[in-house]
Curated annotation (Swiss-Prot):
InterPro entries: CyaY, Frataxin/CyaY, Frataxin/CyaY_sf, Frataxin_CS. It holds the Pfam family Frataxin_Cyay. This is Iron-sulfur cluster assembly protein CyaY. One of its GO terms (molecular function) is ferric iron binding. NCBIfam families: FeS_CyaY. The gene is cyaY.
Length: 107
């Protein structure tokens, strides 16, 4: 994958997250901000989830209260380089814990 393809795929990831939050009708207020390639989710309790792109490595990084994760694209899925878990699974687990209610980013 070249740099422009990586950015296109990361942009698609950001847009999906933002669209799911725009459509979400849960009780918690979750703010989504994108600034310079970094996506920040801010929760009512003051906690944050930060997702950023690491262009030199063609990785997406996820920082949550539970820890940090690095994802490589394998086929159509972003997969954690340590645990083998999917990006969406880890993001949903962290967001659910930090929001205090179930959050899904998959349509």
């Amino acid at each position: 994958m070249n740099d422009s393809e990586f950015h296109r795929l990361a942009d698609n990831l950001w847009q999906t997250i933002e669209a799911r939050l725009d459509d979400w009708d849960g009780d918690s207020d979750i703010d989504c901000e994108i600034n310079g390639g970094v996506l920040t989710l801010s929760f009512e309790n003051g906690s944050k989830i930060i997702i950023n792109r690491q262009e030199p490595l063609h990785q997406v990084w996820l920082a949550t209260k539970q820890g940090g994760y690095h994802f490589n694209l394998k086929g159509d899925d972003w997969i954690c380089d340590r645990s083998g878990e999917m990006f969406w699974d880890l993001l949903e687990q962290a967001a659910t814990q930090q929001a205090g209610e179930e959050i899904s980013f998959r349509g």
